[in-house]
C-alpha cells in the first residue's frame, strides 16, 4: 500500500531582473523527506517531491536494505511532517551496523551509500550480450532534448531517463540530486517489474562511482551521460563490464568503456577546419 503524495515540482517567485523590472521566475521545489523504516530513522533526503514513494523504494533497493519488493508492506508519505514511513514484513537485518557504515558521496544533495555496497559490487558482472548502436544513442539524445523538463523552466535539477533498446522512453525523472532521480527510476522499475539488462540509462549528471554502482545494482549494462566521469566511476564500470558513454551532446560523445556492445552504424564526416587568410605583408 502506497500513498500518491507528489508535490508540485516548481513554485513561482517574484523577483527583479537586471533592469529593475518585476518578473515572475519559476523555481524548482526542494523539500526534506525523512525516511523511517519500521519506526527507525534511516536518513533525510532533499527532494523535488515529484515521486516520493518511488524515490524511497528505489533508495531501499539500491542500498540493498530490502532484497524483495514483497518484503515492503507499505510506504506512506506525509508532507505535513516531511516524513516517509516504510513498514516491512519482517524488519531489516543488521540495520544498526549498516547505518554506522554510511559513506557520503559526491552527489548533489549529499548522497550516501552503505559501506557493504562496495563489497557487493565485486560480485556483479554484467552479461556481455546485446548491442547499443550509435543511431540509438542519437535517437535517445533527441528524445531527451525535446522532452518537456523542469530544467528548461527553472534549472537547478538533474534528470535521469530509462530507455528501451529501440530508444523508446520508459521513465524520465528530475530531482535536485541525480542520485535521487536514479533511485526514483529504480523504484518505478521495481514496482513495474522492469528488468534492466537490456535497457539504456541516461543521466544529465556526471558518472561518479555512486552512479555506476547504482546502475550496476539495477543490472543496467549501458550508461550514458552528457557530462564527464570520475576515475572511480570508470574503474567500477570496467570491473562490472558496463558500457559507459560520456560527453554525449548533440552528435558528439566519448565511449569511455565498452566490452563490445557499442556499434558504430552512423557515418560521420569530419568538420573541415575554417580557412584562414595569409597574414598581410608589412
Residue ranges and their predicted role:
Residues 273-282:
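Long, low-complexity, intrinsically disordered segments
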Amino acid at each position: 500500500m502506497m500513498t500518491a503524495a507528489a508535490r508540485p515540482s516548481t513554485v513561482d517567485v517574484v523577483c527583479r531582473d537586471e533592469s529593475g523590472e518585476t518578473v515572475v521566475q519559476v523555481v524548482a521545489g526542494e523539500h526534506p523527506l525523512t525516511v523511517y523504516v519500521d519506526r527507525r530513522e534511516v536518513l533525510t533526503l532533499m527532494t523535488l517531491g515529484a515521486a516520493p514513494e518511488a524515490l524511497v523504494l528505489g533508495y531501499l533497493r539500491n542500498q540493498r536494505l530490502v532484497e524483495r519488493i514483497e518484503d515492503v508492506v507499505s510506504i506512506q508519505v506525509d508532507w505535513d511532517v516531511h516524513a516517509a514511513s516504510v513498514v516491512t514484513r519482517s524488519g531489516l537485518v543488521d540495520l544498526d551496523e549498516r547505518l554506522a557504515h554510511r559513506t557520503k558521496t559526491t552527489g548533489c544533495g549529499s548522497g550516501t551509500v552503505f559501506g557493504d555496497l562496495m563489497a557487493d559490487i565485486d560480485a556483479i558482472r554484467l552479461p556481455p550480450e546485446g548491442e547499443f548502436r550509435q543511431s540509438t544513442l542519437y535517437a535517445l539524445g533527441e528524445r531527451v532534448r525535446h522532452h518537456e523538463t523542469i530544467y528548461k523552466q527553472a534549472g537547478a535539477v538533474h534528470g535521469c531517463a530509462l530507455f528501451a533498446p529501440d530508444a523508446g522512453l520508459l521513465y524520465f525523472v528530475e530531482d535536485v540530486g541525480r542520485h535521487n532521480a536514479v533511485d526514483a527510476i529504480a523504484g518505478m522499475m521495481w514496482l513495474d517489474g522492469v528488468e534492466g539488462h537490456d535497457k539504456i540509462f541516461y543521466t544529465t549528471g556526471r558518472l561518479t562511482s555512486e552512479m555506476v554502482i547504482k546502475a550496476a545494482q539495477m543490472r543496467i549494462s549501458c550508461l550514458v551521460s552528457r557530462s564527464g566521469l570520475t576515475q572511480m566511476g570508470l574503474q567500477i564500470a570496467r570491473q562490472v563490464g558496463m558500457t559507459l558513454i560520456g560527453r554525449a551532446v548533440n552528435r558528439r560523445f566519448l565511449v569511455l568503456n565498452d566490452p563490445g556492445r557499442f556499434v558504430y552504424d552512423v557515418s560521420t564526416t569530419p568538420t573541415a577546419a575554417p580557412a584562414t587568410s595569409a597574414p598581410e605583408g608589412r
